[in-house]
Amino acid sequence: MYNYNNSYLHGFRGNIETSQVNNVTNNKTESNDQENKTVTQQQELQQVTPDFNVKVPVGYTKTGVEKLSNGQEIHCYKLNNGQKVMIAPKESAMTTLNTYVNTGSMNEKDDERGISHFCEHMAFNGTKGSDGYEKLGIGDVFRKVGDMGGRTNASTNFAETNYTISIPQFNKNDFETIVKMQSSMMNNLEMSDNMVDKEHGPVTSEINMYSDMPDNIAANVAIKNLYNIQTTSDDVVAGTVDNIMNVDSKKVIDYYKNNYYPANMTTVVTGDVNPDEAIEIIAKNFRGENPSKTDRRMEALKPIDKTVRKDIISNKAVATTGVICFNGPENNNTKDNIAIELVNEYLFNRLNSKINQSLDE
């Protein structure tokens, strides 16, 4: 966009005045010719049409550099719209872009249980291509990432939804390409009635698949009992077939407005990238705006204070499945979480773990 100030015209008039002083014999006709040229110059400038589609990058602040025990540096930023960004540069064959949305099944109404997972599916069904975001059709993300030799996926959990793209960077512009795609998925989805109706089938099929998995059944029963979650859904994350069939475009749009906004997202980059260059690309593309107000639901978790045992008999099981759950430390308690991981590894996750040894005996 051009800035039409008076400095250029003032300089032009100055040239006319100098010419008039040096040529006092010039007649009125010559003076009028100069004035006409001035008018012509001004008219030509006014015909320039500014490009209103140019998008200004979101500003950002570098909040620090964290250093892990292995020497890995993590460059931390916060965009002016509240979105957090963490960049971990390292030599790697793959560069991975993850965006975590701070929402999951614990943010759903019970009669809409499963809508977080449904919205995860919708993210791959195309974007509108408005407001300067990239236009994507159904399956375009999978196709384009596949053409680059990469992979893409997403997952929904109790408290977060994660979108990931991982590629080998053969070309310099590949990183910006995947950032543009993911930012469009987060901010510019096509959520028409037709698109929502088409996704009912795949999502309900997935629910039916999970209902036949003994380990999934056991895990859901354990979680619901551990935190006294009152729900009509057998699967806390996937929801029920009835819930999903009742999801329409209005419910999807409302859920997005209340949960998918910059201040509720964190983007993490790992791989062979320059942090200074990467943050500029991210700030230019993740330029979403926060709603003036939100109506977020938070599940009231009430951990049990005594041991609960549930036995499930299923004709779908081919072996015995056991699940043990307990209320662990908060997410930001790094020390205790590391200790819990070590205990889990010792007890469960090795071939020669204590549990396996006991079962063998």
Question: Where are the predicted features?
Answer:
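M16/MPP (pitrilysin/insulinase) zinc-metallopeptidase core fold and M16-derived inactive scaffolds
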Residues: 91, 96-168, 234-236, 346-361
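Pocket-edge structural micro-motifs
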Residues: 78-81, 87-89, 101, 154-156, ...
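Proteolytic maturation boundary segments
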Residues: 42-87, 274-313
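Short, compositionally biased, intrinsically disordered N-terminal export/targeting signals
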Residues: 1-29, 33-44
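His/Glu-based metal-binding/catalytic segments typifying zinc-dependent metallopeptidases
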Residues: 98-100, 294-356
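Charge-rich, well-structured scaffold segments of protease-associated domains
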Residues: 45-56, 78, 134-294, 320-322, ...
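Structural beta-strand/beta-sheet cores of well-ordered domains, especially the beta-sheet scaffolds
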Residues: 75, 83, 95-97, 114, ...
